[in-house]
Amino acid sequence: MKFIVKPHPEVFVKSDSVRKRFIRILESNLRSIIQRETKGVEVINRRDHIEVTGLSDEYRDVTLSVLTQTPGIHHVLEVKQSGFKDMHDIFEQCLEMNREVIEGKTFCVRVKRRGNHDFTSIELERYVGGGLNQSVESASVRLKNPEVTVKFEVANDKLNLIIARHKGLGGFPLGTQEDVLSLISGGFDSGVSSYLHIKRGSKVHYLFFNLGGPAHEIGVKQVSHFLWKKYGSSAKVKFISVDFDPVVAEILEKVDDGQMGVILKRMFMRAGGMVAEKFGIEGLVTGEALGQVSSQTLTNLRHIDNVTDSLILRPLINWDKEDIIDLAREIGTEDFAKTMPEYCGVISKKPTVKAVKEKLEKEEAKFDFSVLEQAVYNARVMDIRDIEKESQEQAPEVEMVSELGSDVVVLDIRSAEEEDEKPLELDGVEVTHIPFFKLATKFGDLDQSKEYLLYCERGVMSRLQALLLIENGYKNVKVYRP
């Protein structure tokens, strides 16, 4: 198993010292994750690229998943590496790998070469291409728009025959940009905006203003943990939860209805600024898009921004909702967002779309700011890696089962893609697939005389979903951990 990792082109327009630092950080990030997820896989910095090698293909899929989900990588070449004697030896190796691929098709040969050789890249392309054309009678050369492009690299004394090219995430290596604090609600927008800053190289910490109780917090923890685990697990980041119920109660009691939405957002930014300052974070990230709701007009956004000195970053400011949902689907947060409640939208019955500074200040003069300060002071800060541990501690009443009786039903709560990739088949036991995001609404329709065991790959989602069901009064739920 061998992969050649090509950093994003923007890395190479940096100065020499910055480029070297970025690639060292990318190397460190990859090594951190790969050593945790695999055994015997090496990560080697080759200055202008990174090589990832293993003695066998045992961890091929896991390694490729890490490489294509790590920020800072443009593409990944899956290669077969060997030595060579001369151009004819290279041709013979290319023929062995590509004979069946080019049969009955048009093709061309493209070579990248580094090092000192007695041939040029063009000479090698012509030699190998001519040899393939003569050796495979049904194939024909076409230099423009061929059906097959035979690609390989010659690096000094090594020949890299390209098996496949995999698209990377792009962006900058995680940790090359300054940290940001994402105001996450668990919906489509905040998940996508968090992802975009991870992709751009920032360690994203998560700040959650809890308006919906334990169930809402569990849901937001799930999506935050998912984003960190899939795209940023080389970084140590924080999940911070602030109970905003007292703040909302104060607004509802003392603030004019039309100003409530903007004032709530101003309170979010004030609290976010306090938390960011405490942890030395320069920027707040939100999922706001221009004109999407009443508080997101230019006038209202300006009034919202003015309450904090923190830089407010809005990567989705000009995005259409449809495009946001499409990206959420692509990165894997759509299923979380579908069932995530939006509590902020009910705050005003007749919200203003063009708030006036004097009116806002008049209404905020009625507000007891000690309530906000106390809420921030009582914020709960945790390492995002502890969410998995907490799910076990929060649900001690959730029984873990490893052996199955014939009278139980196993609910596979993984996504459809995960279930298709690794179907759960158990002899003599009924297995039903209900994705986790449908479980809350579908579970009540099941036969409640039966006992249900929830299953997912790592046991994190199944524990959290079991806790939610138990909180909703269901007692016939356990977790299956084979």
Curated annotation (Swiss-Prot):
Keyword flag Cell cycle: no
The protein's annotated pathway: Cofactor biosynthesis; thiamine diphosphate biosynthesis
Matching InterPro entries: Rhodanese-like_dom, Rhodanese-like_dom_sf, Rossmann-like_a/b/a_fold, ThiI_AANH, ThiI_fer, ThiI_N, THII_Thiazole_biosynth_dom, THUMP_dom
EC top class named in words: transferase
CDD domains the UniProt entry points to: PPase_ThiI, RHOD, THUMP_ThiI
UniProt GO molecular function: ATP binding; CCA tRNA nucleotidyltransferase activity; tRNA binding; tRNA-uracil-4 sulfurtransferase activity
The enzyme's E.C. designation: 2.8.1.4
Gene3D superfamilies: 3.30.2130.30, HUPs (3.40.50.620), Rhodanese-like domain (3.40.250.10)
Pfam families xrefs: ThiI, ThiI_fer, THUMP
Keywords for the protein's UniProt record, in alphabetical order: ATP-binding, Cytoplasm, Disulfide bond, Nucleotide-binding, Redox-active center, RNA-binding, Thiamine biosynthesis, Transferase, tRNA-binding
Domain THUMP: 61-165
Family: Belongs to the ThiI family.
Protein name, entry field: tRNA sulfurtransferase
Organism for this UniProt entry: Aliivibrio fischeri (strain MJ11)
Gene this chain is encoded by: thiI
